[in-house]
């Protein structure tokens, strides 16, 4: 299972088989980034949990089934160890534009910055992607990337969709993904379980 946009890969039993964490010094710098905390919240996925700077009940409802729940922390005092990703969530995509510009200017040469959704901007270690993680996952297999198919709906799927033998874009995908991968076939909507119906 590939998680955190490729920063972690686990087998079916949950054992970690690949890891690519953000350097701690970069994480601590990311905590200091200026942003409007009335419009944006900062989160981290780390080896010891999911952390956030403020309580956001609407996020909690998406994690009822898994039991994976955030812990509210003061990031001025929080550690930066074992960080899969630092991510910023806003209600309005426009509120992330200035932050994205800042991140790309100050961290673009040493991190991977990508949207996983229209309102979620994520920062991982340099060269982290689902495509890279998939290539690591296949290292000891008798088949490669070109023997795989993949489905995606976000900008964080670009490398994976481009590197596999056949990539499909969901109908409800981020328009920026469709623009980046115009050559890929578009199929139905996630809500219609199109992947299961098609394959």
PLM region descriptions:
Residues 163, 171-199:
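Asp-based, Mg2+/Mn2+-dependent phosphohydrolase catalytic module
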Residues 1-25:
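Alpha-helical substrate-recognition element adjacent to the catalytic core
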């Amino acid at each position: 299972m590939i998680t955190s946009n490729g920063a972690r890969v686990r087998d079916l039993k949950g054992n970690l088989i690949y890891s690519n964490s953000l350097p701690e010094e970069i994480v601590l710098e990311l905590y200091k980034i200026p942003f409007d905390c009335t419009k944006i919240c900062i989160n981290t996925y780390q080896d010891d949990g999911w952390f956030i700077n403020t309580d956001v009940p609407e996020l909690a409802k998406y994690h009822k089934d898994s039991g994976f729940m955030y812990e509210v922390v003061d990031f001025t005092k929080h550690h930066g160890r074992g960080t899969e990703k630092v991510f910023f969530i806003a209600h309005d995509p426009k509120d992330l534009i200035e932050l994205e510009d800042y991140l790309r200017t100050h961290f673009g040469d040493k991190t991977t910055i990508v949207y996983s959704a229209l309102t979620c901007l994520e920062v991982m270690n340099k060269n982290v992607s689902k495509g890279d993680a998939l290539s690591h996952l296949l290292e000891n297999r008798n088949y490669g990337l070109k023997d795989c198919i993949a489905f995606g709906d976000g900008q964080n799927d670009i490398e994976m969709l481009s590197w596999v033998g056949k990539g499909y874009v969901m109908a409800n995908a981020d328009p920026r993904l469709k623009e980046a991968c115009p050559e890929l076939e578009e199929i139905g909507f996630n809500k219609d379980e199109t992947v299961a119906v098609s394959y």
